[in-house]
Every structure is written in structure tokens, then in C-alpha cells.
Design a protein with these regions (language model features):
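Acidic, low-complexity, intrinsically disordered interaction modules
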Residues: 16-71
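Short terminal alpha-helical segments
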Residues: 1-25
Length: 81
């Protein structure tokens, strides 16, 4: 996924939790915050844009968090920050 600058900035408060998910393969982000992150990326109707519509399985959630973190890293590296 490719993030806009606005999305990247909105996701910064979650960066440590996303990094932890990637390095430890463990998800510590509360579900409410995870849903907020999905809304930042996909918009208000995020549940119609991803499958499954609500990733409740730990592995699916972890996989998405790692993908989001990787996208944040790519944005940071491409913007020179």
C-alpha cells in the first residue's frame, strides 16, 4: 500500500506498536486503535474495501499491521525524513 503524507502523519502515534508487531510477530495494538488505523488508510467505509471486512483473527491483524508498518517505512525512506 502507498500512504499519503496525511495518512503517514495520522499513523505516527501507532508506529511503535506496528514496529513491535513486525519485530516480535506479536500484536499489542488494542482492537479499537487497529480499527482507527484502518479508517485512516481506507477511509470511513474501510470495511467494504478489505477482506475479511473485520480482521479479528490474530494472524490476519498481525499481517496487516506489518504491512502498514512497511508502508510507513517506505514513505519515510522515500520522503527523506
Amino acid at each position: 500500500m502507498i500512504l499519503t503524507e496525511e495518512q503517514y502523519k495520522a499513523l505516527l502515534p501507532f508506529e511503535a506498536e506496528f514496529r513491535y508487531a513486525k519485530t516480535s510477530q506479536c500484536c499489542i495494538l488494542p482492537h479499537v486503535k487497529f480499527l482507527k488505523a484502518l479508517e485512516i488508510i481506507y477511509g470511513k467505509n474501510w470495511n467494504t474495501k478489505i477482506s475479511p471486512s473485520i480482521p479479528t483473527c490474530g494472524y490476519c491483524k498481525l499481517k496487516m499491521m506489518v504491512e502498514i508498518y512497511d508502508s510507513m517505512e517506505r514513505f519515510k525512506n522515500n520522503s527523506g525524513n
